[in-house]
Amino acid sequence: MNIYAVGGAIRDELLGVPVQDRDYVVVGATPEQMAAQGFRPVGKDFPVFLHPRTQEEYALARTERKTAAGYHGFQFHYAPDVTLDEDLARRDLTVNAMAREVSPEGELVGPVIDPFDGQADLRARVFRHVSDAFVEDPVRILRIARFAARFADFTVADETLALMRRMVDAGEVDALVPERVWQEIARGLMEAKPSRMFAVLRECGALARILPEVDALWGVPQRADYHPEVDTGVHVMMVVDYAAKQGYSLPVRFAALTHDLGKATTPADVLPRHVGHEGRSVDLLKPLCERLRVPNECRDLALVVAREHGNLHRVMEMGAAALVRLFERSDALRKPARFAEMLQACESDARGRLGLDAQPYPQAERLRVALAAARSVDAGAIARGIGNDTEKIKEAVHRARIEAVAQALEIGE
């Protein structure tokens, strides 16, 4: 048998970026031979094995044939006579269809095996499909978009983009399972330039199918005195990229993506103002999260940011009572870590505007000081002093928090 490192590891090595995971293909072996050498089978649809020492994945060389719509509609063929070139031919992009042989000691040896000119496309910074079989797997649309977010200086070849459009028009994207769509969107959000992912998805028409609420934001005007970039879609991409540049968490980046969804449904006769867009954003966000089965942590932060971001921007005008009500609505007193992420999302919103990425955001420090003061109130001591009257306790604690915030900020109630 011969073992080869394949795919992203070879690509990243040639690009000079850190290799995170290595995938291996085994040519000339059977499942029985792999098991005899201590490899543990883990593949459900085709033979994949874990190395007995490193626990890395090794797959038998295979070919595949489309048999039904969607991500799972494939029939796989694996046998000792399947060649490395045949295995590489089923891969999505030329830059991912390269290999190097692995020695018995686990070292990469010999030249790069590159039957589809992936090295030339790497130099040209182009994502190009290996063959027309690309159209058989709709996940590849999401993968290319995610790669664009990681390698922001790459472009998609015209002929590849044409295939992607054909797949979208044929309804292939509609057959994707929600969990896989979310997985790829989430991974793309965590890349260096998430806006590139959404640009590619828009260009091929896929964004309108998988995230129509986001796609609808382009072309919606905002007030130029607040938003020099004017276009809401452009603004949201700037917000997401700012959050990515700061290294913020996935929940923060998802909240950045979805905070202004309601602007797409603003009545045309009131544009470019967007009064009440926060509530409309929440109304759109709830079914989106349900449809894609967004994890609770991401959903909950996104909902509270969508609802409250306008209020957070206006905190310099608020008295102590309004600030305490904001903390209570946002559950900040019980969940200060989540509130810190709210601040990150709102700061990204404020700085995700043309020419304003270094704009001061004093609201964040004011809210941090105010929340610390509100949380310093000893609710237990107040309760012990009052007794069993729950309503009186609640009112007294609320009043004490207002007084603490007013004192900390030296403002009126």
UniProtKB/Swiss-Prot annotation:
Cofactor(s) demanded: Mg(2+); Ni(2+)
InterPro entries to which the protein is assigned, alphabetical: CCA_bact (IPR012006), HD_domain (IPR006674), NT_sf (IPR043519), PolA_pol_head_dom (IPR002646), PolyA_RNA-bd (IPR032828), tRNA_CCA-adding_enzyme (IPR050124)
Binding site for Mg(2+): 21, 23
Transmembrane segments: none
EC number: 2.7.7.72, 3.1.3.-, 3.1.4.-
GO-annotated biological processes: RNA repair; tRNA 3'-terminal CCA addition
Reactions this protein catalyses: a tRNA precursor + 2 CTP + ATP = a tRNA with a 3' CCA end + 3 diphosphate; a tRNA with a 3' CCA end + 2 CTP + ATP = a tRNA with a 3' CCACCA end + 3 diphosphate
Keyword set, alphabetical order: ATP-binding, Hydrolase, Magnesium, Metal-binding, Multifunctional enzyme, Nickel, Nucleotide-binding, Nucleotidyltransferase, RNA repair, RNA-binding, Transferase, tRNA processing
Residues bound to ATP: 8, 11, 91, 143, 146
Cofactor-binding details, from the entry: Magnesium is required for nucleotidyltransferase activity.
Cross-referenced CDD domains: NT_ClassII-CCAase
An example molecular function term from Gene Ontology annotations: ATP binding
Signal peptide: none
Domain (HD) ranges: 232-333
Residues reported in the UniProt entry to bind CTP: 8, 11, 91, 143, 146
Domain of life, source organism: Bacteria
SUPFAM superfamilies found in the cross-reference section: Nucleotidyltransferase, Poly A polymerase C-terminal region-like
Pfam families to which the protein is assigned, alphabetical: HD (PF01966), PolyA_pol (PF01743), PolyA_pol_RNAbd (PF12627)
Family as reported in the entry's similarity comment: Belongs to the tRNA nucleotidyltransferase/poly(A) polymerase family. Bacterial CCA-adding enzyme type 1 subfamily.
Note: A single active site specifically recognizes both ATP and CTP and is responsible for their addition.
Quaternary structure annotation from Swiss-Prot or TrEMBL: Monomer. Can also form homodimers and oligomers.
UniProt domain comment: Comprises two domains: an N-terminal domain containing the nucleotidyltransferase activity and a C-terminal HD domain associated with both phosphodiesterase and phosphatase activities.
Role: Catalyzes the addition and repair of the essential 3'-terminal CCA sequence in tRNAs without using a nucleic acid template. Adds these three nucleotides in the order of C, C, and A to the tRNA nucleotide-73, using CTP and ATP as substrates and producing inorganic pyrophosphate. tRNA 3'-terminal CCA addition is required both for tRNA processing and repair. Also involved in tRNA surveillance by mediating tandem CCA addition to generate a CCACCA at the 3' terminus of unstable tRNAs. While stable tRNAs receive only 3'-terminal CCA, unstable tRNAs are marked with CCACCA and rapidly degraded.
Name this polypeptide is given: Multifunctional CCA protein
Gene designation: cca
